[in-house]
């Protein structure tokens, strides 16, 4: 007998040990990410062919203490490699792990390779060649701290490669993980099994192969052990022949029914092709269908629903997933009473949206991603009971009630003012720390980063409740909800893209058309707290030369131009935002040489600017130390210097509208007086109703020449 290590994923060790025991292995011992055992050639051949859970099997040749590269080389070269494979065979070393002395896996692989070829040379034999592309032999090394395991791989390519799935649908599961999910889903092999989001069909195909008692490796063409010196081809041919006969007979004996649904017809075609290649196409019925509206198919009595719904890691995908899980949970309760369900997901928050209590739950990894599998018993209930349960449950009642109240008050005001964009919630309740903005028929939820003393799981659960409640209260479609996380900005982070959606939306603000982008940047292109400021600038701009500094997307410039400004000059450091400003102007028919755009550091531009303006709007950052700016800027410290440069450009009778977001900003009125300027605080006049709870969102000043 030889010593072996069956390699698997974390969380599957005990399940694999049970499987190996059923395959005739005695004393299978689970270890981290694997199972150790002893086996004869016949036993290991059967394990390789029949294991649904192992990713590979390794014949362990040595376990040793490895403090440095010399330990590694000496232990490797002491093995009689001639007994393992012929010098004509090509090999490769798969080296996993590092320690204090062996810090690079490639270096570790090289030392093992040296030990192997030196063993052959010492026996007067040719050096075997290395082949990374098509090796006959794979040497497996696992190093953790000072412990090393060295052996030869019995499999070749990973055992998850069953041979039936050359291509996959979205986010495919490995076949070994799919088999584990099926084994733990509560299905006994005879009940009907349904996957409402089947993708490329892996869960159903693995289950059908189990029901048919079909060896998962029956379609594989090549095995690592076939290149070993002790390979027994006649024994292997006999074992493989038995499995082939069993596969053909087993399919005909299956009574269980399998149903697969997906809303993507192209992915369904892939699933059907995979089932055909696996030899189980006659057992599975595939059809197009939406999990949110799925109904019980004919013949599905006391069955099991098993599924791996999407669980996007990008935050921006969450609202749609929350709506999907919520609707899916409702449909399970409405249509599948008396059945069982098993759902696999990386997100416990999404699973909570099912609103079902789990009977059992398991932890498994999907690659490096920790996941949960939860099993549910679905109670028999009447349609009226289900409908009442779903419609009467209010999500996050305090938050929902506040949101309803705000929508009633602010929505009425926005319609009267002819505004497409407005805020309906602004962290009104401390425990629900988000801002919610309406942009036409879409909603943006901005989550303020939770304090460090709030557990991450609690913050995630609360955000899930916010999204679900917002969808429930507003009736907005989930695909029209955008989620962002606001954190303290540094340097040029406000200019950096968050994604590549590149969808823009045209909105209306007091008769002015503006372009917003809800997806690609942290900000949308429109600061909603300044809507009244922009309207006022438009009212003041008739026949005047207008200057907009730190202009962002130029929305204030558009208001001034539409209001009848004689000329406009728009200055911003970002070329992206200047182009956006040009698009905003063109959208409103404001084109011509009288409208100038300058890409520049506004502070440097002011130092050298010439010309005179009747109306200047400036909304600088509170603080900036951007690499693209030569010096730092602090609005409290530097606002008098700023006004000194602005006064030089301000015509007699002209006005500066100066705004910033610094809380507790204090205008240096004495410094202004020395410049011959005076300031009037107009902050309250520029605060719109939707920001009335946050009176420090901005401060705004009207600066003019002193009389």
Curated annotation (Swiss-Prot):
GO terms for molecular function: 23S rRNA (guanine(2445)-N(2))-methyltransferase activity; RNA binding; rRNA (guanine-N7-)-methyltransferase activity. Gene3D superfamilies: 3.30.2130.30, RNA methyltransferase domain (HRMD) like, Vaccinia Virus protein VP39. It comes from the Bacteria. Its EC number is 2.1.1.173, 2.1.1.264. It is found in: Cytoplasm. Belongs to the methyltransferase superfamily. RlmKL family. Keywords: Cytoplasm, Methyltransferase, RNA-binding, rRNA processing, S-adenosyl-L-methionine, Transferase. InterPro entries: 23SrRNA_methyltr_KL, DNA_methylase_N6_adenine_CS, RlmKL-like_Mtase, RlmKL-like_Mtase_CS, RlmL_1st, SAM-dep_methyl-trfase, SAM-dependent_MTases_sf, THUMP_dom. Residues 43-154 form the THUMP domain. NCBIfam families: PRK11783.1. PROSITE patterns: THUMP, UPF0020. It catalyses: guanosine(2445) in 23S rRNA + S-adenosyl-L-methionine = N(2)-methylguanosine(2445) in 23S rRNA + S-adenosyl-L-homocysteine + H(+); guanosine(2069) in 23S rRNA + S-adenosyl-L-methionine = N(2)-methylguanosine(2069) in 23S rRNA + S-adenosyl-L-homocysteine + H(+). One of its GO terms (cellular component) is cytoplasm. Its main location: cytoplasm. This is Ribosomal RNA large subunit methyltransferase K/L. PANTHER family: RIBOSOMAL RNA LARGE SUBUNIT METHYLTRANSFERASE K/L, RIBOSOMAL RNA LARGE SUBUNIT METHYLTRANSFERASE K_L. The gene is rlmL.
């Amino acid at each position: 007998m030889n010593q072996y290590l069956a390699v698997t994923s974390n969380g599957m060790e005990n399940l694999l040990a049970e499987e190996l025991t059923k395959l005739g292995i005695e004393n299978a011992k689970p270890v981290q990410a694997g199972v150790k055992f002893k086996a004869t050639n016949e036993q290991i051949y059967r394990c390789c062919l029949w294991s649904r859970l192992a990713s590979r099997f390794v014949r362990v040749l040595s376990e040793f203490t490895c403090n440095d590269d010399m330990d590694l080389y000496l232990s490797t070269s002491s093995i009689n490699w001639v007994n393992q494979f012929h010098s004509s065979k090509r090999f490769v070393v798969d080296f996993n792990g590092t320690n204090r002395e062996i810090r690079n896996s490639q270096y570790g692989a090289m030392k093992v390779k040296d030990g192997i070829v030196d063993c052959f040379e010492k026996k007067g034999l040719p050096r075997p060649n290395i082949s990374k592309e098509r090796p006959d032999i794979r040497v497996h090394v696992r190093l953790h701290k000072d412990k090393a395991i060295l052996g030869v791989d019995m499999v070749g390519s990973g055992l998850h490669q069953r041979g039936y799935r050359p291509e996959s649908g979205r986010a495919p599961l490995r076949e070994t993980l799919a088999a584990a999910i099926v084994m733990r889903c509560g299905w006994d092999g005879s009940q009907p099994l349904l996957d409402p989001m089947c993708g490329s069909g892996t869960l159903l195909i693995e289950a059908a192969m189990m029901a048919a008692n079909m060896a998962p490796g029956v379609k594989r063409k090549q095995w690592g052990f076939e290149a070993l010196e002790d390979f027994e081809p006649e024994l292997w041919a006999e074992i493989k022949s038995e499995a082939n006969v069993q596969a053909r007979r087993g399919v005909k004996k299956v009574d269980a029914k399998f149903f697969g649904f997906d809303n993507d017809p192209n992915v369904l075609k892939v699933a059907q092709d995979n089932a055909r290649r696996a030899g189980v196409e006659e057992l599975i019925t595939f059809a197009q269908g939406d999990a949110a509206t799925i109904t019980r198919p004919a013949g599905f009595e006391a069955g099991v629903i098993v599924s791996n719904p999407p669980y996007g890691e990008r935050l921006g995908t969450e609202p749609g997933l929350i709506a999907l899980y919520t609707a899916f949970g409702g449909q399970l309760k409405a249509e599948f009473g008396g059945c069982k369900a098993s759902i696999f997901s990386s997100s416990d928050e999404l699973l909570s949206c099912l609103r079902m209590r789990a009977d059992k739950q398991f932890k498994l990894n999907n690659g490096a991603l920790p996941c949960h599998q939860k099993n549910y018993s679905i109670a028999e209930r009447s349609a009226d009971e289900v409908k009442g349960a779903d419609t009467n449950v209010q999500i996050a009642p305090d938050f929902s009630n506040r949101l309803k109240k705000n929508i009633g008050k602010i929505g009425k005001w926005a319609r009267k003012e002819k505004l497409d964009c407005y805020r309906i919630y602004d962290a009104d309740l401390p425990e629900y720390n988000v801002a919610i903005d309406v942009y036409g028929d879409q909603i943006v939820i901005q989550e303020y980063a939770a304090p460090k003393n709030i557990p991450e799981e609690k913050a995630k659960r609360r955000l899930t409740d916010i999204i679900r409640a917002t969808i429930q209260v507003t009736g907005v479609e989930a695909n029209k909800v955008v989620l962002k996380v606001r954190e303290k900005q540094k340097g040029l982070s406000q200019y950096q893209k968050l994604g590549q959606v590149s969808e823009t939306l045209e909105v209306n603000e007091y008769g002015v058309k503006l372009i917003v982008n809800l997806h690609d940047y942290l900000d949308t292109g429109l600061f909603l707290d300044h809507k009244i400021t922009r309207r006022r600038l438009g009212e003041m701009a008739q026949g005047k030369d207008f200057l907009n500094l730190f202009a962002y997307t130029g929305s204030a410039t558009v208001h001034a131009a539409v209001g009848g400004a004689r000329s406009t000059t728009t200055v911003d450091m970002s070329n992206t935002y200047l182009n956006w400003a040009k698009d905003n102007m063109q959208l409103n028919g404001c084109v011509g040489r009288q409208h100038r755009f300058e890409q520049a550091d506004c502070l440097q531009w002011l130092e050298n600017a010439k010309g005179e303006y009747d109306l200047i709007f400036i909304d600088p950052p509170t603080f900036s130390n951007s690499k693209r700016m030569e010096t730092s800027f602090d609005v409290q410290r530097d606002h008098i210097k700023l006004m000194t440069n602005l006064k030089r450009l301000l015509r007699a009778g002209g006005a500066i509208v100066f705004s910033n977001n610094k809380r507790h900003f204090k205008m240096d009125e004495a410094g202004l007086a020395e410049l011959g300027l005076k300031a009037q605080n107009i902050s309250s006049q520029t605060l719109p109703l939707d920001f009335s709870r946050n009176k420090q969102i901005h401060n705004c000043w009207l600066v003019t020449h002193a009389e």
